[in-house]
Every structure is written in C-alpha cells, then in structure tokens.
Amino acid sequence: CKTAPNEHVSVTFAMNGTCANHALDMKDCNERGDLYAVTDLPIINNDNFADWVRGWCALSDNIVIWYYSLDTHVQAYTMLDVVYDDIMFFKECGVRGLFVEAETKGLGLQYVMTDIIYKMNWNPDMTEEEFDVTLDSILEQDFGEGWAYIREYLDGTLNKAQDIADQCWNCWGYMTL
C-alpha cells in the first residue's frame, strides 16, 4: 500500500486467510501464522488484514473487498457472529464494493449468511438490531414455522464458537493449529 492507483483503476483486495472466528478489527484474533504466497511477513492475523484495508482505502476510493466467507465442507460453523462487524469495518474504511465468495447451495446454512450480506449491501447503515430482525426474517422465509428452532441452533453454535474464542480458524473452514 505505497503507490496510489490511477483514479480509474479499481483495486480488488482478496481477504484470503483471515480468521473466521474473529472480526477483522476487534483485536480478538491472537493466532498468527504464515500466509503462503500473499506476504513475506512471517506472522499475520486479522489485525494485519485490517491494517492493509485501511492502507488501501487511504490510497484510493476504488477498493473492492473479496470477502471469503466460506463453509466449503459440511460444517456447523458460520461467520454470522463476525460478518456484521466486518462489513461495518469495510464501510467505515470507505470500501466501494464487496464480492462475497461463499457457498450458496447445498448443505449447511451458508446461503443464509450470503442472503444477509446481500441485504446489508442494500442497507449499509443497518444496526445490529436490524441485522437480527433481518436474520430472523430470512430464517422464517426459508424454514417456515420452524425458523425459531434454526435460530436457536445458530445462536447455540455461535455461543459455542465463542467458548473457544481463543481459537482461530481459517476462512476456508479449518482450524489454524
């Protein structure tokens, strides 16, 4: 992040390798590991990614984030507990666009998260309360009368993730041990 691009150039910054258990700019991510082929830094975590986003946004108004919110295996985890904070962080930095890489079909609840991210793109001033109401609405639309049980399951899964909050896992869906 040293040279400003031409004003007609959009820079796409791929957030490959972020920790999926912690929001980008919350200083909660304590694991540090190598990120092959991306940087020469020997240790990186979400703080580094947050600094890089700030740096790029300081150089250009045309930053697009490639956000990996993957659940590429049959797993219980989602990033619903960090996605709101991450998108608000991007907004505060002045990010112009967001490309979400995620599974939208098949098993799991990944499509629920992509739905809520799309809705946040249309309403970037969404509050956390509106986020929760929107999530409930998506679940009700998709699961009908049983939506509250799915919400209870999600909340339990997210609470369990926070029980192991000192653990980090890669945005591709595996623990970074």
What is each of the regions a protein language model found here?
Residues 149-153:
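Peripheral, non-AAA+ core regions of ATP-driven protein-machinery
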Residues 156-157, 168:
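Residue-level signal for alpha-helical context at structural boundaries
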Residues 167-177:
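Histidine-centered catalytic/metal-binding microenvironments
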